[in-house]
């Protein structure tokens, strides 16, 4: 389960070049399973494979047919996945789920469950936080990084990225930590926080930019072929 508790927008200076997702051989068994899953979403307003919190509530006058799905190889494993995104709902209900086909059950299984602010990269997801209620201010919109684990056929949390602006506070009462002036060697007035495996570390701007380049250099966002969750589009998956 991959669901950071925060929200969207990042500043970019230019539109990134987007690469197309791979075009795997069509698997009609998988598509039939995706079709059944989408009918559960469309007809029953339920998320498949989420028995405890599976109800979908769409705010009127919108309907489920205003929400989106895509069938494409998003994780790069050579097989198609089903992506379903619901955003016209209460904040906690906004989510995107990536489903893979499970040939053992002839059904679907969840590869990723996250907030809707997702940018897809080959083998990687960047998920914008749903809120920015910490100390980041305008420096950064918090985000998480997850990597595709081929052995597990699912995405695994890797990093959570936040920032701390000294103008907002010079003391974190939650962790009882003073602002790390020793890290902010350029006196920018802010530092970045990288959480990995439950361990948080601070970085100054120069170190963060190097770290960020290591994550994103040579990675282009994938173009996801989104379409509306309509009966016609669902029926067209398998003819």
Predicted regions span which residues?
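Acidic, small-residue rich beta-repeat scaffolds with periodic aromatic anchors
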Residues: 4, 8-9, 23-40, 130-239
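Ser/Thr-rich, Proline-interspersed low-complexity disordered segments
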Residues: 13-21
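Blade-edge motifs of beta-propeller repeat domains
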Residues: 23-63, 105-117, 230-232
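Beta-propeller blade termini
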Residues: 65-74, 116-126
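Acidic/hydrophobic-patterned starts of short beta strands in beta-sheet-rich repeat architectures
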Residues: 76-86, 123-131
């Amino acid at each position: 389960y991959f669901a950071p508790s925060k929200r969207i927008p990042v500043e970019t200076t230019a539109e990134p070049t987007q690469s197309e997702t791979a075009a795997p051989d069509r698997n009609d068994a998988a598509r039939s399973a995706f079709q059944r899953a989408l009918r559960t979403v469309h007809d029953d307003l339920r998320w498949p494979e989420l028995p405890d919190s599976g109800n979908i509530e769409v705010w009127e006058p919108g309907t489920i047919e205003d929400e989106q799905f895509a069938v494409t190889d998003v994780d790069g494993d050579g097989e198609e996945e089903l992506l379903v995104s619901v955003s016209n709902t209460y904040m906690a209900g906004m989510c995107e789920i990536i489903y893979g086909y499970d040939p053992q059950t002839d059904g679907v299984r969840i590869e990723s469950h996250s907030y809707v602010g997702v940018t897809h990269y080959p083998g990687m997801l960047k998920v914008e936080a749903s809120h920015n209620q910490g100390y980041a201010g305008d420096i950064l919109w918090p985000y998480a990084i997850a990597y595709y684990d081929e052995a597990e056929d699912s995405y695994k949390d890797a990093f959570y990225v936040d920032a701390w602006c000294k103008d907002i506070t010079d003391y974190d009462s939650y962790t009882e930590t003073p602002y790390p002036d020793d890290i902010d060697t350029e006196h920018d007035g802010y530092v970045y926080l990288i959480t990995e495996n439950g361990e948080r570390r601070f970085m100054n701007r120069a170190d963060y930019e190097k770290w960020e380049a290591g994550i994103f250099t040579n990675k282009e966002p994938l173009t996801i072929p989104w379409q509306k969750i309509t009966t016609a589009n669902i029926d067209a998956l398998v003819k």
